């Protein structure tokens, strides 16, 4: 699958692509788990950078052993915060242009992880989604209300509070 991503990287005229663990809602349990799709890494925190000739996986200390087992054949593993992505990228002989899905990053996370080590190019269509056709895998489920035992308050009471707040604005 990495080879398919590298073809897309070439087609987009970029040097690499950044894949975080999170989804666009920054959920703890991300779906789709794009990082696992591309790296096989199943930990709850991590980020991959796929370059034309190298693959990097950044994980925190809880996951270094797991990352080596699950992804070590195809990725160079780095432990954050001991080594930040910008430190690795600065060692490359040129300043790469990296694509990223702008829905998956905050401005602060881009600055803290990449500083001035690369040129960042937002790409609106997520490249991992293109490879795995992930946009068609979202399954709708019926919504449901949690019981008052769980929420501490009836739904109608919460809706009334929300309604009065919105009326004031």
Predicted regions and their residues:
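Ligand-binding face of N-terminal immunoglobulin V-set domains in extracellular IgSF glycoproteins
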Residues: 98
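N-terminal accessory/capping or targeting/presequence segment of soluble
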Residues: 1-93, 101-169
């Amino acid at each position: 699958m990495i080879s398919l991503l590298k073809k897309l990287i070439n087609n987009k005229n970029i040097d690499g692509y950044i894949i975080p663990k999170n989804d666009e809602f920054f959920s703890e349990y991300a779906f789709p788990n794009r990082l696992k799709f591309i790296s096989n890494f199943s930990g709850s925190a991590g980020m991959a950078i796929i370059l034309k000739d190298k693959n990097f996986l950044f994980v925190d200390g809880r996951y270094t052993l797991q990352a080596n087992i699950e992804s070590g054949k195809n990725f160079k593993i780095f432990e954050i915060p001991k080594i930040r992505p910008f430190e690795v990228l600065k060692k490359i002989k040129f300043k790469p242009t990296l694509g990223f899905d702008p829905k998956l990053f905050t401005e602060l996370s881009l600055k803290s992880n990449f500083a001035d080590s690369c040129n960042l190019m937002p790409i609106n269509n997520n490249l991992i989604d293109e490879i795995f056709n992930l946009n068609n895998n979202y399954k709708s489920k019926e919504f449901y209300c949690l019981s008052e035992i769980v929420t501490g308050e009836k739904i109608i009471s919460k809706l009334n509070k929300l309604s009065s707040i919105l009326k004031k604005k």
